Amino acid sequence: MNTILTCQDEYFAGGLGYDCPYFSSTSASTVDVSKETWVSLWASGLLDNRSSNHGPHTQGQLYNMGNSLQEDYLFGDQLSSQISANKQLQDTLLQKEEELSRLHEENNKLKEFLNSAFVKTLAEKTKKLLHQNGQSSFCTNPNSRVPFSSNSTPGSKAKRARRNLYGELTACEAQSSPVVEKWVLQTLGLKDVDTIDDSALANYSAMSLQPKQDSPSSGYSSAHLTPGHSQAATSCSLSPSQCSSASLPESETASPLSSPTYHTPDVAPNKTEVAFSTSLHPHCNVKTHSFPQGQAFVRRDTQGGWKFTWVPKQSE
């Protein structure tokens, strides 16, 4: 029961790391270990073993706590970066929403402008102009339109349009111009309204058909005026009787032109007794003055003077 054990015994409760309160040189004969002493030593050894066994667990807990703090720090960094990215996305979204609202506002303004009366008026004017270009503005003739051809070029279309417009304009002018009788053309020495008759027959007929001496209109066949008095000859506006004879030369004051007497000759309208005394030439400029009593023809001669011919009105 009273077994003596040294402090260095490995089977002792304290083990190798146990602090022995006695010296190892103490012999068993000198030490009297009672039961109470052994119990007290054994209890103290248990307490020391418990404290030594709890040491490594505390270090592991500290290591785990450090790792958790590091992980929390890294997670906080990631969270802050995600928060900043989210904020940037929110700012971009706000900008896009503002731009979208501005585009909607501009679209509404454009719709209001297109629906305004000004644009509608312009559209109507454009339709009218296109309609006028499609149809003739001179003489509308639906039968004269050329059918559309898919293989026609723009140049041919433009030429065809010019030809159509020219033809319609010519037709309108031909319809609006009055019909000139043949005896009037022969009197003026013309083949037609736009052509001068230079044939010998026309010249001969104008020169040879002189009025008779007893004809009432024989005194009005021709009167020669110098260039200095040409303005006086063309200033007759109402009747030949208003033309003053004071502006004529002294050699021509006795001319019947100064005080004409109007008579109605008994000749047919197709006769040429009262025609020009000279023929017409391409370089001659003929001016016609119409009066209630008849017509006056004034033209420039080759010497620079003026030829005046009075044609009384013929009775029907």
From Swiss-Prot:
CDD domains assigned to the protein according to its UniProt record, in alphabetical order: GemC1_CC
GO biological process, one term: negative regulation of cell cycle
Keyword ATP-binding: no
Residue spans of biased composition, Polar residues class: 134-155, 207-234, 253-262
One Gene Ontology MF term: chromatin binding
Residues carrying Phosphothreonine: T153
Modifications made to the protein after synthesis: Highly phosphorylated by cdk2; stimulates initiation of DNA replication.
Keywords tagged on the record: Cell cycle, Coiled coil, DNA replication, Nucleus, Phosphoprotein
Biased composition (Low complexity): 235-252
Cellular compartment(s): Nucleus
Effect of S177A: Abolishes phosphorylation by cdk2
Coiled-coil annotated residue ranges, if any: 82-117
Effect seen on changing T226A: Abolishes phosphorylation by cdk2
Entry comment describing in which tissues the protein is expressed: Expressed in most tissues. Enriched in proliferating cells from skin and gut.
Nucleus as UniProt keyword: yes
Family membership noted in the UniProt record: Belongs to the GEMC1 family.
Protein name per its UniProtKB record: Geminin coiled-coil domain-containing protein 1
Lineage: Eukaryota, Metazoa, Chordata, Craniata, Vertebrata
